[in-house]
């Protein structure tokens, strides 16, 4: 079986139906001995460009493992579901279980109070003559 990353965008008026959609698609995968490695609900987000005169949509990310027949059935159901505005399926080399950058960005957004302060950066250089590592810390200047 192959590994795939699937992102689909749901119409914002159908946001309350997203959990039922996820359940249905998950069952389609697991019924045929497939597996879901990562499932993330990114929620309603601003679209980069309008799709069908809509400016926001509900995003879902799935990393799955399935056979080609299951994938064809899944894509077929995406195409004929009017609530799904767009979908993208990408073949991956292996399973991905770590949080996506979108989820990491939500957790690591800096507070508004700490905008003016900059953390020191650390540069590590290898001194090949002595075989030792040299560590130098630099302060970022944030003068306005």
Swiss-Prot record:
According to its record, what are the GO cellular component terms? cytosolic small ribosomal subunit
Query: InterPro entries, per this entry?
Result: Ribosomal_bS6, Ribosomal_bS6_sf, Ribosomal_S6_plastid/chlpt, Transl_elong_EF1B/ribsomal_bS6
- Gene3D superfamilies, from UniProt? 3.30.70.60
Q: Which key words are in the record? A: Ribonucleoprotein, Ribosomal protein, RNA-binding, rRNA-binding
Q: Name one GO biological process term.
A: translation
Bias category Basic and acidic residues: which stretches?
A: 104-114
Instruction: Identify the NCBIfam families for this entry.
Output: S6
Q: Of which family is this protein a member?
A: Belongs to the bacterial ribosomal protein bS6 family.
Task: Write down what this protein is called.
Answer: Small ribosomal subunit protein bS6
Q: Which organism is it from?
A: Nitrosomonas eutropha (strain DSM 101675 / C91 / Nm57)
Taxon lineage: Bacteria, Pseudomonadati, Pseudomonadota, Betaproteobacteria, Nitrosomonadales
Q: Quote the gene name from the UniProt entry.
A: rpsF
């Amino acid at each position: 079986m192959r590994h795939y990353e699937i992102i689909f965008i749901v119409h914002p008026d159908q946001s309350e139906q997203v959990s039922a959609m996820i359940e249905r698609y998950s069952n389609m995968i697991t019924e045929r001995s497939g597996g879901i490695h990562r499932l993330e609900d990114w929620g309603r987000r601003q679209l980069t460009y309008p799709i069908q005169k809509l400016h926001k949509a509900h995003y879902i990310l799935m990393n799955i493992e399935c056979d080609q027949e299951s994938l064809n059935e899944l894509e077929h159901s995406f195409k004929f579901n009017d609530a799904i505005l767009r979908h993208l399926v990408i073949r991956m080399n292996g399973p991905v279980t770590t949080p996506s950058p979108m989820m990491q960005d939500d957790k690591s957004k800096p507070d508004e109070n700490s905008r003016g302060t900059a953390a020191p950066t650390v540069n590590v250089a290898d001194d090949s003559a002595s075989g030792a590592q040299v560590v130098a810390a630099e302060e970022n200047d944030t003068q306005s």
